[in-house]
């Protein structure tokens, strides 16, 4: 019997890959190594647990054991892969060696916590996994005032959800506006107004200098001298790919594990996908590219030829009172055709040559997102 495919990780990317492989081959041996219990859950739901009053247990779709049985895989739960021996084609976990025919890194990413001072750093929570929510669930449910570090996609969604659930919320963001890496300024401003309508306090152009325990509360000092007394601090300041084992194994690693359009790393027997992978220089921490990557990689693993093609992809900002959808490419140099109304905004980006390169729609106009995405895709293919 040939050595199995080994997948390191049990998040969305890993399980999407397993499902894709099993659609092509019901019997090829697969082993999954995961540091947690391997439960299947929908990670984007973590941004909306407070308004829905969901516990960590509510988010579990299937236990790790049930997933393994259903998809005919061997699950090594609570088993950390310590090293990869590329010459021998083995992984080392808990001191034992396990051989592989092909190895897949689906190790995801960890929440990035910016450098701060103070004796309260251990109380700064993150919400990047089911296990992290389990740890944060009780402190956050008791908290009346929550400070969110980071005004990007996840930070904004969580802040609005916390406010909707009745909590006082302060967002600290180092950029001059929210979602600075995603949205043009004329879209970010109405979003900021919506958040302030929900009572959310915004500290833009700011960063947290220190977190100090003061009795039952946390004293937060910003770099500009402002101070807040809060009950909880939640950090949503971006992600950092989990690449340590891959780097130690000698694989090419930059911001993520470097892969080509076949999801192959610098080792012909090793692949990577999901939040840990850097595809042709790009980090793509969204669900759609992971699904597309899983389909391509599944074919590779069963001996078929496939290459990843990435169409224009939609990004949704799930802020119910002011929904935003966007796709394509735009930059500070883009020219914009903008349609404004009290119901929302339709904005189309054009290059200096007048080519349609991307769009943003908000409010009630999110219904126009798919026709615009279709138009964008047709132009990209044309």
Curated annotation (Swiss-Prot):
Disulfide bonds: none annotated. GO terms for molecular function: oxidoreductase activity, acting on iron-sulfur proteins as donors, NAD or NADP as acceptor. Pathway: Nitrogen metabolism; nitric oxide reduction. It is an enzyme of class 1 (oxidoreductase). Its main location: cytoplasm. It is found in: Cytoplasm. NCBIfam families: PRK04965.1 (NF003437). This is Nitric oxide reductase FlRd-NAD(+) reductase.
